[in-house]
Amino acid sequence: MQMRNMIWPWRRKSRRRMARIVVDGPITGATRKRVLKALREVKQREFPALLLRIDSPGGTVGDSQEIHAALLRLREQGCRVVASFGNISASGGVYIGVAAEKIVANPGTITGSIGVI
């Protein structure tokens, strides 16, 4: 697993932690496997929050759906999820992001085009 796809706990002066997962590039079967593995670790380690950084033009529908569903299940178990859109979040990137309770993006972020082929 490459460094950019790992979970990163942050600690300040307390025991509170947050996980970070990066979805970078096209969403493929390999992306799905990597992200689902990271989400399982977030669940097992009981992180109270997840920052999901998305910089993706999209990808396959099935892989995006599986990540979306896994994020919703994680939220049901009490983990707070925030999506942060990078330079681009389109198609499957947006689909994954809407599973978060909040989305943040820069004014110049290219966003949208769900379902356009």
Give, region by region, the residue ranges found by the protein language model.
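Terminal-region recognition feature
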Residues: M1-I117
